[in-house]
A protein has these predicted regions:
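Intrinsically disordered, low-complexity N-proximal targeting/linker segments that flank membranes
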Residues: 2-79, 83, 88-89, 95
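Long, cytosolic, alpha-helical-rich C-terminal regions that act as interaction/scaffolding modules
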Residues: 79-82, 86-164
């Protein structure tokens, strides 16, 4: 163990400043931080198993963008792009589940039978839990999930002594 002082002490986050930056950040799919945050969120759960490194992962909009275009049932288009509406999902499933209503996506998250055999569901535990416990995924769910992600990340920063 080193007796040197922690040089990182000068770079710790001010909690309010961090929350302001986080709340103003646009988590668009093309920004690397978006996929990093939702991957952190998925693996922050103790019951999330590791997936094969060969697994191709994409960003899933739990509340489909296409659904917003058709129904206009959210107060703004920005909510579709909220971090609270995004999850990582295997590409093989995202292709099938992309434009459906939540009640239809549940089948793809859970897996289903076809005449040619079973189609495996996602290994993302949060999505299978959502499918088991929710009949829909609405604006209030997006907001609650966003707040859970933010608060959990702040707790993570605190537990690693990264907050001033």
């Amino acid at each position: 163990s080193s007796d040197l002082p922690n040089a990182f002490a000068d770079y710790k986050f001010d909690i309010q400043q961090f929350k302001n930056i986080f709340n103003n950040y646009k988590f668009f799919n093309g920004r690397p931080l978006t996929k990093s945050m939702i991957t952190w969120w998925a693996y922050n759960s103790d019951d999330q198993e590791l997936m094969s490194l060969e697994t191709v992962i994409e960003i899933e909009h739990i509340y489909a963008r296409n659904r917003f275009e058709k129904e206009h049932s959210l107060t703004s288009k920005e909510i579709v792009e909220s971090l609270g509406n995004k999850a990582i999902l295997e590409k093989r499933i995202n292709i099938r589940a992309s434009d459906y209503r939540f009640e239809d996506k549940k089948k793809y998250y859970n897996g289903y039978e076809t005449p040619r055999g079973p189609k495996a569901g996602t290994k993302i535990r949060e999505l299978t839990n959502l499918a088991a416990s929710n009949t829909d995924f609405k604006e209030s769910d997006i907001e609650a999930r966003y707040n859970s992600i933010l608060n959990s990340f702040v707790d993570y920063l605190k537990s690693n002594e990264l907050i001033k």
